[in-house]
């Protein structure tokens, strides 16, 4: 915190942590450390967890919400707060509450987005005012998908996902289906059938594509649909309404883009009852983008 500046109020409530879609995802190689190199475009969408923060003066960091299957000490939001505390040298702590809406293991970045919202919110709540690049560096130490949410806009990503270039995307509506099946990321990336040699694209290739939602493919899709039957069935069903429907991330969510809300809602009305679905609008920027 800059000397002489007043602290903001002690609470930040209703902080969104929006989901993302991977419009395509190409696996281009594997590094000696085991991480895969990727190319993808991240599309932010208006479907969010909501986080609430209360500043503490004793330096203690707690998650006050119970999340089944996610111990507080290993939760990315707690790890993000601790990393932010260490990087900034602040004396403050925080109580964090989470309204968890986004499905875990869905490929839409829920945990990573929660971590990024924590970094952005604490940057404001603690008055530390770290630059965005520093928050992105902290985010990368937590997970490869965290930096794009801190980056704050739709982006063409390379490396392990941390080399980001902003891209302009048209306003869109999406149907996102979660087939109520958890897909562990490690189970997909460790599969021996995964191809890891997709040709390198450049951002100009994507920018020049007239239908950006038909560009490329998701290299993880064939593995996920072979291993997880509900993912395959949901994708096959959605392709009846959009030939360019595809999986996001390593699954389990699948999505399709539509020109308008009415068309997307008509598809949603036909959704089989055994799956969960959502009609969502695209975002051009993260709701907390100005916090860094």
From Swiss-Prot:
Q: Which Pfam families match?
A: GHMP_kinases_C (PF08544), GHMP_kinases_N (PF00288)
Catalysed reaction(s) here are: 4-CDP-2-C-methyl-D-erythritol + ATP = 4-CDP-2-C-methyl-D-erythritol 2-phosphate + ADP + H(+)
User: Which pathway does UniProt place it in?
Assistant: Isoprenoid biosynthesis; isopentenyl diphosphate biosynthesis via DXP pathway; isopentenyl diphosphate from 1-deoxy-D-xylulose 5-phosphate: step 3/6
Asked if the Swiss-Prot or TrEMBL record annotates the protein with the keyword S-adenosyl-L-methionine, the reply is no
* Keyword ATP-binding listed: yes
Give GO BP annotations, semicolon-separated: isopentenyl diphosphate biosynthetic process, methylerythritol 4-phosphate pathway; terpenoid biosynthetic process
The lineage's top-level taxon is Bacteria
Q: Which family does it belong to?
A: Belongs to the GHMP kinase family. IspE subfamily.
Under the heading HAMAP family, the entry gives: IspE
Q: What does this protein do?
A: Catalyzes the phosphorylation of the position 2 hydroxy group of 4-diphosphocytidyl-2C-methyl-D-erythritol.
According to UniProt, the name of this protein is: 4-diphosphocytidyl-2-C-methyl-D-erythritol kinase
What is this protein's gene name?
ispE
């Amino acid at each position: 915190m800059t000397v002489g500046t007043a602290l903001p109020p002690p609470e930040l409530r209703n902080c969104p942590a929006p989901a993302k879609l991977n419009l395509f995802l190409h696996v281009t190689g594997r590094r000696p450390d085991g991480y895969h190199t990727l190319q993808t475009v991240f599309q932010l969408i208006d479907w969010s967890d909501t986080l609430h923060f209360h500043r503490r003066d004793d330096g203690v960091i707690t998650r006050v919400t119970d999340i089944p299957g996610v111990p507080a000490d290993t939760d990315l939001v707690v790890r993000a707060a601790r990393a932010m505390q260490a990087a900034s040298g602040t004396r403050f702590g925080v109580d964090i509450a989470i309204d968890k809406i986004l499905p875990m293991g869905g490929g839409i970045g829920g945990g990573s987005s929660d971590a990024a919202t924590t970094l952005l919110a604490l940057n404001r709540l603690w008055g530390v005012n770290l630059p965005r690049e520093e928050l992105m560096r902290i985010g990368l130490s937590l997970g490869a998908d965290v930096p794009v949410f801190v980056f704050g806009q739709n982006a063409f990503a390379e490396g392990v996902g941390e080399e980001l270039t902003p891209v302009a995307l048209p306003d869109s509506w999406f149907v996102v289906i979660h087939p109520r099946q958890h897909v562990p990321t490690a189970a997909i990336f460790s599969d021996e059938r995964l191809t890891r040699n997709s040709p390198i694209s450049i951002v100009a290739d994507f920018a020049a594509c007239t239908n950006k939602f038909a560009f490329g493919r998701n290299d993880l899709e064939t593995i996920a649909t072979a291993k997880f039957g509900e993912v395959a069935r949901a994708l096959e069903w959605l392709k009846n309404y959009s030939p360019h429907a595809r999986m996001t991330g390593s699954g389990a969510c699948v999505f399709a883009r539509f020109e308008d809300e009415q068309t997307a809602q008509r598809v949603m009305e036909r959704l089989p009852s055994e799956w969960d679905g959502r009609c969502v609008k695209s975002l051009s920027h993260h709701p907390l983008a100005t916090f860094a």
